[in-house]
From Swiss-Prot:
EC nos: 7.6.2.-
The protein's name in its UniProt record: Hemin import ATP-binding protein HmuV
Primary location recorded for the protein, binned into one broad class: membrane
Any GO molecular function: ATP binding
Record's bilayer topology term: Peripheral membrane protein
PROSITE patterns: ABC_TRANSPORTER_2, HMUV
Function as written in the Swiss-Prot or TrEMBL entry: Part of the ABC transporter complex HmuTUV involved in hemin import. Responsible for energy coupling to the transport system.
Family: Belongs to the ABC transporter superfamily. Heme (hemin) importer (TC 3.A.1.14.5) family.
ABC transporter domain location: 5-241
Protein encoded by which gene: hmuV
Amino acid sequence: MSGGLKAEAASFALPGATLVDRVDLTITQGELVAIVGPNGAGKSTLLRMLSGDLRPTSGTVSLDGRALADYPPRALAARRAMLAQHTTVSFPFSVEEIVAMGADIDPRKAAPLFDAALRDVGLDHFRHRDITTLSGGEQQRAHFARILVQLWSGEADAGPGLLLLDEPTSSLDIRHQLDLAETARRCARRGTTVIAILHDLNLAARFADRIIVLSGGRIAADGAPAAVLRHELIADVFDVALTVNTDVAGQPFVLPELADDRRAAAHA
């Protein structure tokens, strides 16, 4: 993905509402980018535009200098994989069958990819389980394995691709949130471009190279975590009181300010 992913004045509007408003951004190969913002900020709409799932109503989104709208569906599927916010399967497919849906190569060549993806998400011992019997978090991990296989099978011919994750940790416990973030970071270090919508600002600060803050369909901030996570910005965008601190390695982290703490500080 030598040319990177680029949005130029990209907007998406419905009658009476603009969900994403003239967004300009460039994301280079191997970056791990977190998109954060309050509910209704336009994060999922922007991610779908960056994936090619939604065509901008104005402006353009391009991959390697070519508009996403100009890619044939199969060619685009070989270049990018997206984990949707919610994926429901009503039929009793096994976990391995779900993962296999991501492959577009000879099944004999795909088998090692299945094994690696299932190990990465911690479901190798569940490969023969009916996916409808799994918990919501386990199902989310199975679908993450599926898109990893899609990504890896496409990269075999097309080179490093694009991995898009829409709130991938929403159903996961702490351990598996960290496991998923580590897997995403390994993908980025191998050259894959990773874009993830996250609500956990500390997870974003710990794993992302760059944080984009979206508010009202527009980019409110874009940069390294330490530059973006500022008290004033968080208060303005999220309408909440948080304290921004820095750990011994210089990484920012945020903690909530409780009402009692604010009252005590005011009278100190």
